[in-house]
A protein has these predicted regions:
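Bacterial Sec-dependent N-terminal signal peptides
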Residues: 1-22
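N-terminal regions that are enriched for targeting/export leaders
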Residues: 22-77
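Post-signal peptide N-terminal segment of secreted/secretory-pathway proteins
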Residues: 65-66, 70-135
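Structural recognition of the beta-strand scaffold that forms the well-ordered cores
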Residues: 89, 115-118, 162-164, 173-176, ...
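Papain-like cysteine protease catalytic cores
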Residues: 113-241
């Protein structure tokens, strides 16, 4: 009898076990009943009437933030990229203007972002057209051609793109080529350029080899005309007076964009800076190159060394200690109080409020496309604890004075470790152990890699 009961019990357990593991491709009543029981009935009613992030915001944490730094480089008035994706250009130029302002004791000064934007769009257009020529024998629906025609060019970029434009075309003061309606809000300009590029792209695919160059140059002439109508003529020569912060004239000269660059930008941007990445989905201490990531066709694609965050933080602190700002990009859409200018992983504990788990590692977030490199900025300060470890970082943003502290924003160290992607620093702050790695042959990453 006991044996029969035991066998029956084991059978029930087996049946229950099989039943519990049964796959269902649809939601049934049993599931929703379990969901309801799991959720419970004691809920915070504020979530029904208010923005979830307003309800979950840790206001005590927000109140604890300030801009106190152990080392701070820039106190400059912030710039404003407005409704454009030119953060990479703004942050690069913000780093370069800081050295110029400091050297000559200047007041507010900006390099022309419109000048850089003009040439960047023209160069990206040329790269697109050359890519079309390179792949014109492949079907139009081949992956590379689908990628090209889906978005022929964009207004985004990275430090290497800015370096290429500055080296090739020089720089000018903002007042020489100021911001225009279509630089501050470039959506329709970019759409128009893309329309023209798609049209000429199809012509190139159908053309004889002997006609390719003339068609390409006609396309670029049209793009140039569109840019001039919306952004103005880029100057070939101009007169400009260097003044100190009191308005006293130091010198007045006639410049070209290249002579202006040579006088006021002391760096060889191609060689004085090193580009790094923190991507835990790929092996560290290896070089990578992103296919078709350059703007100027004759320059190299964006190439970087992938390193752990500890290396990046060490170089970052060393850079700021020596009065040198650095360039970086991060997912600034994550765990942030935008107008308050605070970035902290503990700002909102929605998982705890809802009784669910939202935790993921950085590697998991990158692999699942949860996070991406969304915005490039210039780092200008850091607060260290008693042991010399970074606690928080101060950023010179490029969205005007309305966010944070007159446009400066603060990032918790843990936030930076979690959401930083790209990092560019002067070569003199790179540890000796990393320098030989920069000479290694990079592995090529495909154009459509979503992380880059």
């Amino acid at each position: 009898m006991c044996k029969k009961l035991l066998v029956s019990a084991l059978g029930l357990i087996l049946v229950f076990s099989v039943s519990a593991q049964e796959r269902k491709k649809f939601i049934d009543r049993q599931m929703t009943d379990r969901f309801r029981e799991h959720t419970g009935t004691v809920l915070d009613s504020r979530f029904l009437e208010q923005d979830m992030y307003e309800v979950a915001l840790d206001r005590e944490l927000v109140a604890s933030y300030d801009t106190v730094c152990t080392y701070r480089v820039s106190h400059n008035q912030v710039t404003d990229q407005m409704k454009s994706g030119r953060c990479w250009l703004f942050s690069t130029l913000n780093i370069l203007r800081e050295e110029m302002i400091r050297e000559y004791d200047m007041g507010h000064f900006e390099f022309s972002q419109t000048h850089g934007m003009f040439w960047d769009i023209l160069e990206k257009s040329n790269r697109f057209l050359e890519n079309v020529i390179d792949y014109r024998k492949k079907p139009i629906d081949a992956r590379i051609n689908a990628w090209l025609f889906r978005k022929p060019i964009g207004d985004g970029g990275h430090f290497a793109n800015a370096a290429h434009i500055i080296e090739k075309y020089g720089v000018v003061p903002q007042e020489i080529m100021p911001e225009r309606f279509s630089s501050l809000d470039n959506k329709w300009l970019m759409n128009l350029v893309r329309t023209s590029l798609r049209r000429y792209g199809l012509k190139l695919r159908d053309a004889d080899a002997k006609d390719l160059q003339s068609i390409k140059e006609t396309a670029l002439s049209d793009i140039y005309s569109i840019l001039v109508h919306n952004l103005g003529h880029p100057p070939t020569e101009f007169e400009w007076s260097l003044k100190d912060k009191e308005g006293n004239v130091i010198s007045t000269k006639t410049y070209t964009p290249q002579s202006f660059r040579q006088e006021f930008i002391k760096h060889d941007l191609e060689n004085d800076y090193v580009i790094f990445m923190n991507d835990p989905t790929k092996p560290y201490y290896r070089m990578y190159r992103v296919e078709n990531s350059r703007n100027c066709y004759e320059y190299a694609d964006w190439t970087f060394l992938n390193v752990p965050m500890d290396d990046i933080l060490t170089m970052g602190v060393e850079s700021l200690k020596n009065n040198s700002m650095f360039y970086f990009s991060a997912d600034t859409d994550a765990s942030m109080l935008m107008m308050g200018g605070i970035y902290d992983v503990a700002l909102y504990d929605l998982g705890k409020r809802y009784g669910v788990s939202l935790d993921m590692t950085k590697e998991e977030m990158i692999r699942s496309l949860e996070i991406k490199s969304a915005h490039a900025i210039a780092m200008t300060g850091v607060e260290l604890d008693a042991d010399g470890k970074p606690v928080k970082w101060l950023v010179e943003n490029s969205f005007g004075k309305v966010r944070g502290w007159d446009g400066y924003v603060v990032m918790q160290n843990e936030w930076l470790k979690t959401y930083l992607f790209r990092f560019t620093v002067e070569r003199r702050f790179v540890p000796e152990k990393l320098l030989p790695l920069l000479e290694r042959k990079p592995r090529v990453l495909k154009t459509w890699n979503p992380t880059y």
